């Protein structure tokens, strides 16, 4: 485990194991100040960090779930092929199960991965619409 991985919460450390994602040999982590993005095969899972800032509040599971649902609803309008679902994460932080059953311990926005080099093209398509 790298030094950076040791600083991650147990849930994120555990979700870096590729066996959580069928047919995946490796998982890449991208962090922002408000989320963790787990890139796994054809999919990306965005998990909100439990933070409260002047411009947003992700401090509780309920608020993070609501924000995930809002993100899906808003972004699906322009990118329905990318924004797929809000999925629950179940079991325990040390042994999580994606899209399992029971009471969720966390939520993630499930997205289809895309080639980042296509972003300028996607922006232009959007600008052509407005």
Where are these regions (language model features)?
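Short, Lys/Arg-enriched N-terminal segments with co-localized hydrophobic residues
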Residues: 1-3
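Conserved ATP-binding subdomain of kinase catalytic cores across diverse folds
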Residues: 7-130
């Amino acid at each position: 485990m790298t030094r950076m991985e040791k600083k991650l919460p147990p849930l994120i450390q555990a979700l870096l194991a590729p066996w959580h994602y069928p047919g995946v040999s490796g998982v890449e982590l991208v962090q922002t100040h408000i989320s963790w993005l787990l890139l796994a095969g054809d999919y990306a899972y965005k998990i909100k960090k439990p933070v409260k800032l002047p411009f947003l509040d992700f401090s509780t599971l309920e608020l993070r779930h609501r924000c995930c649902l809002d993100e899906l609803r808003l972004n699906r309008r322009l990118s329905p092929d990318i924004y797929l679902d809000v999925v629950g994460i179940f079991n325990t932080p040390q042994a999580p199960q994606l899209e399992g059953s029971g009471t969720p311990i966390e939520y993630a926005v499930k997205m289809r991965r895309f080639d980042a080099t296509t972003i300028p093209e996607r922006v232009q398509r959007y600008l052509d619409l407005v």
